[in-house]
A protein has these predicted regions:
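N-terminal secretory signal peptides that target proteins for export/translocation
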Residues: 1-8
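N-terminal type II signal-anchor transmembrane helix
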Residues: 27-28, 340
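Active-site-adjacent loops and short helices of periplasmic peptidoglycan-processing enzymes
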Residues: 32-203, 209-216
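Alpha-helical transmembrane segments of integral membrane proteins
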Residues: 8, 12-15
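Bacterial N-terminal signal peptides
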Residues: 15-26
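Domain-terminus/edge residues, biased toward the C-terminal soluble/receptor-binding domains
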Residues: 194-199, 203-204, 209-397
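Hydrophobic alpha-helical transmembrane segments of integral membrane proteins
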Residues: 15-17, 80, 252
Length: 397
């Protein structure tokens, strides 16, 4: 006999049939007599009509819940948002962020190339940390080149192999893509310059961003408005970096990465927080115009307007609720009575129209060892399951 309780469901005694207890989960008889719940995951919304981006994906990465979606699986050139993967591969292969790296002639970019850069010179000596800031703030293609060559060389050395260090780095980028289970992403360079075989999707770029921003050094660099350091080497000088993400500090945005090419349009990835949850928002192919010299015209750049519109719509159309007594009175006490706890206590994101009529049902199986899953917390709006949380046995081993 198991006792399951939930506000508005009342107290129910269940005599559990053997084939049900085999799964350790049961359903309240008061629910069993009603119509079956609707699907538990709501569909992401279409972005507002004034958003110009060709592809959009917004996801609560903590809850794993998509919020907005437009052509999320369309392969597109990501421009310099590529550098999120570059940064991730660097981080995955770095233990000492103060390790010194020397720039070579192959890394130098000229202003006439119309490439973003930090202005390094051959012979300049940087720490990996400094180059990470150059990668994430100024979107320096020269910083990407130095890092790719350095990390690629380390990988070759560790393998006892020879070859082109930059090519080895690109192999590692695509190996990381495969390890993340991404099927519509492929890279041919570390900086994002256009190539028809260099692509990702809004959905998969959001996955890459979530992985990258989970690295403290990447998140810290991406969240800095400015950064200043002095180079070492034959031409010591002060380098001042400025973040290209104009949304930093606005609308809750705490980090981000821009990218722009004629072939890509204006691209932007941002990280923001809602009730402790991390939200990743991606726009690819926002409107932007270029002059006769193929220089972007900032006054025509719509990516920041697109992102602001998405965030504004998000805060109106969704609500974040905590699985505790504030939003679910009595839940904490009931968990204590049964000596169980939630295995996941992050905020639940719901459509705004669902957030005002919530109730819960605690499904429990027999007691088990501490930290073993013994049930599920179901969150309902009407008869629709809108969220689930694992319930674990409390106590100590």
């Amino acid at each position: 006999v198991f006792e399951l309780r939930g506000p508005r469901f009342g107290r129910v005694l269940l005599y559990v049939v053997a084939f049900v207890t085999a799964f350790g989960l049961v359903m309240s008889s008061s629910l069993a007599q009603t119509e079956a719940p609707a699907k538990s995951i709501f569909e992401p919304l279409t972005p507002p009509e004034n958003v110009t981006a060709k592809a959009v994906y917004v996801q609560d990465a903590t809850a794993g819940t998509p919020l907005f979606s437009l052509n999320p699986d369309e392969r597109r050139s990501p421009a310099s948002t590529t550098k999120l993967m570059t940064a991730l591969v660097v981080a995955n292969n770095t233990t000492d962020w103060q390790e010194l790296v020397t720039a070579e002639e192959v890394d130098v970019r000229d202003i006439s190339d119309n490439e973003s850069m930090i202005g390094l010179l051959a012979g300049d000596v940087f720490t990996i940390e400094q180059l990470m800031y150059g990668l994430m703030l100024n979107s320096g293609n020269d910083a990407a080149s130095v890092l790719a060559r350095h990390i690629g060389g380390k990988l070759l050395a560790a393998e006892g192999a020879t070859g082109d260090p930059a090519e080895r780095f690109i192999q590692e980028m695509n190996a990381t893509v495969a390890s993340l289970g991404l099927r519509n992403t492929h890279f041919v360079n570390p900086d994002g310059l256009y190539d028809p075989d260099h692509y990702t999707t809004a959905r998969e770029l959001a996955t890459i961003a979530a992985q990258a921003y989970a690295v403290p050094q990447i998140a810290q660099a991406s969240s800095a408005a400015t950064y200043e350091f002095t180079t070492q080497g034959p031409n010591p000088r002060v380098v001042t970096l400025q973040n290209t993400n104009k949304m930093l500090g606005q609308d809750g945005v705490i980090a981000g990465k821009t990218g722009t090419l004629m072939e890509s349009g204006a691209c932007l990835v941002v990280l923001l927080e809602q009730s402790g949850n991390q939200v990743i928002a991606v726009v690819l192919g926002s409107e932007i115009e270029f002059d006769a010299n193929q220089i972007q015209m900032p006054e025509t750049d719509q990516r920041f307007n697109d992102m602001s519109a998405l965030i504004g719509e998000m805060t109106e159309r969704f609500r974040w609720v905590q699985p505790g007594d504030a939003d679910f009175p009595g839940l904490t006490q009931e968990l204590a009575v049964w000596d169980v706890r939630l295995g996941d206590d992050h905020a639940i994101v719901l459509p705004a129209e669902s957030a005002g009529s919530l109730r819960y049902l605690l499904q429990l199986g027999p007691p088990a060892q501490p930290d073993a899953q013994v049930g599920t917390l179901l969150i309902f709006s009407g008869n629709q399951i809108v969220a689930e949380r694992p319930v674990l046995q409390a106590g100590t081993a």
